[in-house]
Swiss-Prot record:
Protein source organism: Escherichia coli O157:H7
PROSITE patterns named in the record: SF4_HELICASE
GO cellular component: cytosol; primosome complex
Any one GO molecular function term: ATP hydrolysis activity
Entry EC number(s): 5.6.2.3
Stretches assigned to coiled coil: none
Chain residue ranges for the region called Disordered: 1-27
InterPro entries in the cross-refs: AAA+_ATPase, DNA_heli_DnaB-like_N_sf, DNA_helicase_DnaB, DNA_helicase_DnaB-like_C, DNA_helicase_DnaB-like_N, DNA_helicase_N/primase_C, P-loop_NTPase
Similarity annotation: Belongs to the helicase family. DnaB subfamily.
Its biological purpose: The main replicative DNA helicase, it participates in initiation and elongation during chromosome replication. Travels ahead of the DNA replisome, separating dsDNA into templates for DNA synthesis. A processive ATP-dependent 5'-3' DNA helicase it has DNA-dependent ATPase activity.
The protein's name: Replicative DNA helicase DnaB
């Protein structure tokens, strides 16, 4: 067999013996731990799953060890045994046996590892050192960006730093996930049921929407849920979503976070002042206010400033990574978030997938669901509807009307459509009435809830008349 070279430890360790570079810091690593992992796998193939849950090939410091682990993974996937002979043959077929130190080095790995008993601990060491090296690499990247910002502002650089560091943390967190025994799941479930039993909540177990009949249908906006609010133009989807945010902010102390990709923050705030003060938004936009209007607005401003729990980000063209990093920052600074609202989903961008809109929307949808789950917070995302529904006699939306609907419908836990008959029929008997159509609810019923629409105030309110279920 080719590659029968004597063992040379320099094959495993980077050669940095030049006196001129002797003072350079070597990135953290443990050659011994890496060798013990590789040798242990050759001794006991049954430990592969334990190791694969902890490390990937890139976690190994030396290139030979990365090649060896990659080849082990290939053998495992093909159902072949991993031992000295099969590994050497496989590496030789790939033309990499000499580059990893030859047959002699593989034999040395196997010989110097007496057992695989502690292989999980060795794998943890390999992974730990890899994470620290990633942090060093990111720190260097951030430093280089600081010296050469290429037109980026300090805020842009902060976002870059946070997103890169959080990416490492997210990768590390994912390594800790996995199957849970039913006993552990039952313990957590019973604890949650006991908490709900002991705390009065009037049937609202999530974030209170502020709408009694909607709360009855949904039990509130649930933590970790992706909630889609969709409607055709002029139906009031931004108004409805903002009302959900306002109600959540008024009824709890946790911060609520708004990503307004379409509307500047000042315009958002004008709408909120109109909604909460019950002052005509046209009068606010034009400044034509009387003393009573000013009194109402001043009272609302006092409440908002006292609570200080609404955050607005009106950056345009945000990516999922930017949304995640900014949401994490608010959550970290305040010990959690009550609600996240994004207006609207189709304005987000994934530069790497910009050539394929379907894949881009799928990645945006998936990332928002992942964010909701990670921060354990309801994420309300607004979405457009296809124009095709305008051709139907009954223009009430259904799930298939969601633009790029496949991935959105699949990822969403709750889908709510807004329909106001008066938009299409000037003489409608339902003037001032909005229908909130629940098209999908993963853990509850679908159906329709009526609300009163007060457009002059940019406000949806509880409906005093009968609901559909009552008629």
């Amino acid at each position: 067999m080719a590659g029968n070279k004597p063992f040379n430890k320099q094959q495993a360790e980077p050669r940095e013996r030049d006196p001129q570079v002797a003072g350079l810091k070597v990135p953290p690593h443990s050659i011994e731990a890496e060798q013990s992992v590789l040798g242990g796998l050759m001794l006991d193939n049954e430990r592969w799953d334990d190791v694969a849950e902890r490390v990937v090939a890139d976690d190994f410091y030396t290139r030979p060890h990365r090649h060896i682990f990659t080849e082990m993974a290939r053998l495992q996937e093909s159902g072949s045994p991993i031992d000295l002979i099969t590994l050497a043959e496989s590496l030789e077929r790939q033309g990499q046996l000499d580059s990893v130190g030859g047959f002699a080095y593989l034999a040395e790995l196997s010989k110097n590892t007496p057992s695989a008993a502690n292989i999980s601990s060795y794998a943890d060491i390999v992974r730990e050192r890899a994470v620290v090296r990633e942090m060093i690499s990111v720190a260097n990247e951030i430093a280089e960006a600081g010296f050469d910002p290429q037109g980026r502002t300090s805020e842009d650089l902060l976002d870059l730093a946070e997103s890169r560091v959080f990416k490492i943390a997210e990768s590390r967190a994912n390594k800790d996930e996995g199957p849970k025994n039913i006993a552990d799941v039952l313990d957590a479930t019973v604890a949650r049921i006991e908490q709900l039993f002991q705390q009065p909540h009037d049937g609202v177990t999530g974030v209170n929407t502020g709408y009694d009949d909607l709360n009855k249908k949904t039990a509130g906006l649930q933590p970790s849920d992706l909630i889609i609010v969709a409607a055709r133009p002029s139906m009031g989807k931004t108004t409805f979503a903002m009302n959900l945010v306002e109600n959540a902010a008024m009824l709890q102390d946790k911060p609520v976070l708004i990503f307004s990709l379409e509307m500047p923050s000042e315009q958002i705030m004008m709408r909120s002042l109109a909604s909460l003060s019950r002052v005509d938004q046209t009068k606010i936009r034009t400044g034509q206010l009387d003393d009573e209007d000013w009194a109402r607005i001043s009272g609302t401003m006092g409440i908002l400033l006292e609570k200080r729990n609404i955050y607005i980000d009106d950056s345009s063209g945000l990516t999922p990574t930017e949304v995640r990093s900014r949401a994490r920052r608010i959550a970290r600074e305040h010990g959690g978030i009550g609600l996240i609202m994004i207006d609207y989903l189709q304005l987000m961008r994934v530069p790497a997938l910009s050539d394929n809109r379907t894949l881009e929307i799928a990645e945006i949808s998936r990332s928002l669901k992942a964010l909701a789950k990670e921060l354990n917070v309801p994420v309300v995302a607004l979405s457009q509807l296809n124009r095709s529904l305008e051709q139907r006699a009954d223009k009430r939306p259904v799930n298939s009307d969601l633009r790029e609907s496949g991935s959105i419908e699949q990822d969403a836990d709750l889908i709510m459509f807004i329909y106001r008959d008066e938009v299409y029929h000037e003489n409608s008997d339902l003037k001032g009435i909005a229908e909130i159509i629940i098209g999908k609810q993963r853990n509850g019923p679908i159906g329709t809830v009526r609300l009163t629409f007060n457009g002059q105030w940019s406000r949806f309110d509880n409906y005093a008349g009968p609901q559909y279920d009552d008629e």
